[in-house]
Amino acid sequence: MHIDNVVFMKKVLDASAFINGYVPEGRENYTVRSVTEEIRDFRSMMILEDALREGRLKITEPDPESMKVVEDAISESGDIMRLSPTDMEVIGLAVSLRGKDDVTVITDDYTIQNTLKILGIGFRSVLTSGIRDTYSWRRVCTGCRRVYPLDYEFEECEICGSRIVRKRHRN
């Protein structure tokens, strides 16, 4: 499956890229070790192993400074509640590589795409159309509609006693 004609651009692949049949081309493809541990089906494993054996895929980890950038962004947007540690590492690796060259992340994960868009990092989908807008998350009272910070620890509104839920908000 061919995503784009730019073979020399650095690409960071998450598990959904392999699972959805993306075959890395060129030599500038990267992923993190934890992504390789998420690959379980035979076809995806073959794509991954072939790319590693043929030198089309490199496994590397993000630097601590890049992970801090990711943690700050996802804390502010609320995506911290929806991203796994592996997802955060994939985004962190893209931030690490971005300082040197153009980088694109291959992912069908909408939450990863949301964070990448907030950080100004390009992405491509394999099977989905990808996101168009960015979103953040809020905690909102279902009764009086008061907005609470994401780290508000109670489940009931201090004003009216109604339930507090998480809601997506378009930026």
Curated annotation (Swiss-Prot):
Q: What are the names of the required cofactors?
A: Mn(2+); Zn(2+)
Residues in PINc domain copies = 9-114
Q: How is the cofactor bound?
A: Binds 1 zinc ion per subunit.
What UniProt keywords apply to this chain's record, in alphabetical order?
Endonuclease, Hydrolase, Manganese, Metal-binding, Nuclease, Ribosome biogenesis, RNA-binding, rRNA-binding, Toxin-antitoxin system, Zinc
GO terms for biological process, alphabetical: maturation of SSU-rRNA
Assigned GO CC terms: preribosome, small subunit precursor
Q: Report the superkingdom from the record.
A: Archaea
The residues that hold Mn(2+) are D14, D133
Annotated region described as Zinc ribbon, given as residue ranges: 136-171
List the Gene3D superfamilies hit by this protein, alphabetically.
5'-nuclease
What SMART domains would the database entry show?
A: PINc
E.C. number(s) listed in UniProt: 3.1.-.-
Q: Which GO terms describe its molecular function?
A: magnesium ion binding; RNA endonuclease activity; rRNA binding
The free-text function statement in the UniProt record for this protein reads: Toxic component of a type II toxin-antitoxin (TA) system. Processes pre-16S-rRNA at its 3' end (the D-site) to yield the mature 3' end.
Q: Which NCBIfam families match?
A: PRK12496.1-2
* Name of the protein: Endoribonuclease Nob1
What species does this protein belong to?
A: Methanothermobacter thermautotrophicus (strain ATCC 29096 / DSM 1053 / JCM 10044 / NBRC 100330 / Delta H) (Methanobacterium thermoautotrophicum)
